[in-house]
Regions:
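Flexible, acidic/Gly-rich N-terminal and inter-domain linker regions that tether
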Residues: 1-94
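Conserved Radical SAM active-site core
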Residues: 83-188
Length: 188
């Protein structure tokens, strides 16, 4: 959720904008996996919040770690659909790159890519896209510094959700625009 969306939720719950900033910090700076971890919120408020919101909706189905430190995840969404997302490290630098998916399957069916062989199932929501990065951060305890849209799917065929995710990566995760890359098969 964007800060403005959290502020709207706080308004509906009769809470202050300050609470929205606290929750925003828990989500994006600390990558919590449950509302119960937001310990600077009162227990009563956390219970109220749990009635209207949830933090994580994905689970790691498979995790593979290579000898160079690259980690590949198969992330499962509540509807049972799965996508791959990868954490890459280069040259032992502090840069941590998340390769994210934008669709379940792909309609483009490029000859060099296995994803299209299974066909297109659906677009990911912007929340499902950002959840991939949050899943990586929760699992590793590390902050992702770069994003590449080179996972499953054609990002430009899911443009609205990709643009919303980009805005959150840039504004809320504090990842600079120069550290975000979108790869396309040629869709314009």
């Amino acid at each position: 959720m964007k800060l403005e969306e959290i502020e709207d939720l706080m308004n509906k719950l009769g809470a202050t904008k300050f609470r929205a900033k606290q929750i925003h910090n828990w989500l994006y700076a600390k990558s919590v996996s449950s509302i119960d971890e937001m310990t600077n919120l009162s227990k009563d408020f956390r219970e109220q919040l749990k009635q209207t919101a949830s933090v994580t909706e994905t689970k790691i189905k498979i995790k593979q770690v290579s000898s160079d430190g690259t980690i590949k995840y198969l992330v499962e969404y509540p509807d049972g659909e799965c996508v791959e997302t990868v954490l890459m490290r280069f040259d032992n630098r502090a840069n941590l790159t998340a390769c994210v998916s934008s669709q379940v399957g792909c309609a483009v069916n490029c000859s060099f890519c296995a994803t299209g062989k299974g066909g297109f199932k659906r677009n990911l929501t912007y929340k499902e896209i950002i959840e991939q990065v949050l899943t990586i951060q929760r699992d590793t305890g590390l902050k992702v510094t770069n994003i590449v849209f080179m996972g499953q799917g054609e990002p430009l065929l899911n443009l609205d959700n990709v643009l919303k995710a980009l805005e959150i990566f840039n504004n809320d995760f504090q990842i600079g625009a120069r550290r975000i890359t979108i790869s396309t098969s040629g869709i314009i």
